[in-house]
């Protein structure tokens, strides 16, 4: 019986090794075979054929990332709330209590973000 489990893990290990080694091998072979001709024009930013005036990289302030992260968190909340609301009648009291706990935890996170003034745009 343990031989069956060992064979199962062996197959998973083989696929894991293949999944890691094949992309690494393909990238390595591609690096060896491609022509490498560095040029200043290749390193510049492409702006519709125009010569760029300055560096195209713009640094965003951290608060924009926090705002986007909060948006993603509450967007995922709606993904969980919608199916629950659709089948609310069939789930019963246990699912209602679980969803209330979920909403309370997210509300605590929202209140914390509000107190830390993450939601203040300017």
Swiss-Prot record:
- Enzyme nomenclature, EC number: 7.1.1.-
User: Can you state which reaction this protein catalyses?
Assistant: a quinone + NADH + 5 H(+)(in) = a quinol + NAD(+) + 4 H(+)(out)
* Cellular component GO terms held in the UniProt record: NADH dehydrogenase complex; plasma membrane
* Regions crossing the membrane: 10-30, 67-87, 91-111
* Keyword NAD set for record: yes
Subcellular location, record wording: Cell membrane
Source domain of life is Bacteria
Q: What class of enzyme is it?
A: translocase
Translocase as UniProt keyword? yes
Its membrane topology: Multi-pass membrane protein
Instruction: Offer an example of a GO molecular function term for this protein.
Output: NADH:ubiquinone reductase (non-electrogenic) activity
Check the record and name the Pfam families matching this protein: Oxidored_q4 (PF00507)
- Tell me, in one coarse class, where this protein mainly resides: membrane
Sorted alphabetically, which keywords does the UniProt record give?
A: Cell membrane, Membrane, NAD, Quinone, Translocase, Transmembrane, Transmembrane helix, Transport
User: Subunit composition?
Assistant: NDH-1 is composed of 14 different subunits. Subunits NuoA, H, J, K, L, M, N constitute the membrane sector of the complex.
Q: What does this protein do?
A: NDH-1 shuttles electrons from NADH, via FMN and iron-sulfur (Fe-S) centers, to quinones in the respiratory chain. The immediate electron acceptor for the enzyme in this species is believed to be a menaquinone. Couples the redox reaction to proton translocation (for every two electrons transferred, four hydrogen ions are translocated across the cytoplasmic membrane), and thus conserves the redox energy in a proton gradient.
HAMAP family for this protein:
NDH1_NuoA
Q: Which PANTHER family match?
A: NADH-UBIQUINONE OXIDOREDUCTASE CHAIN 3
The family classification in the record reads: Belongs to the complex I subunit 3 family.
Designated name of the protein: NADH-quinone oxidoreductase subunit A
């Amino acid at each position: 019986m343990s031989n069956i489990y060992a064979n199962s893990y062996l197959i998973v290990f083989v696929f894991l090794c293949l999944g890691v080694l094949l992309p690494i091998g393909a990238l390595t072979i591609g690096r060896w075979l491609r022509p490498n001709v560095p040029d200043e024009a290749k390193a510049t930013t492409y702006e519709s054929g125009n010569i760029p005036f300055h560096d195209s990289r713009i640094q965003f302030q951290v608060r924009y990332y926090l705002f986007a992260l909060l948006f993603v968190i509450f967007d995922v909340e709606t993904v969980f709330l919608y199916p629950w609301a659709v089948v609310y009648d069939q789930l019963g009291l246990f699912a209602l209590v679980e969803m209330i706990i979920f909403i309370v935890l997210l509300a605590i996170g929202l209140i914390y973000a509000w107190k830390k003034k993450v939601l203040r745009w300017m």
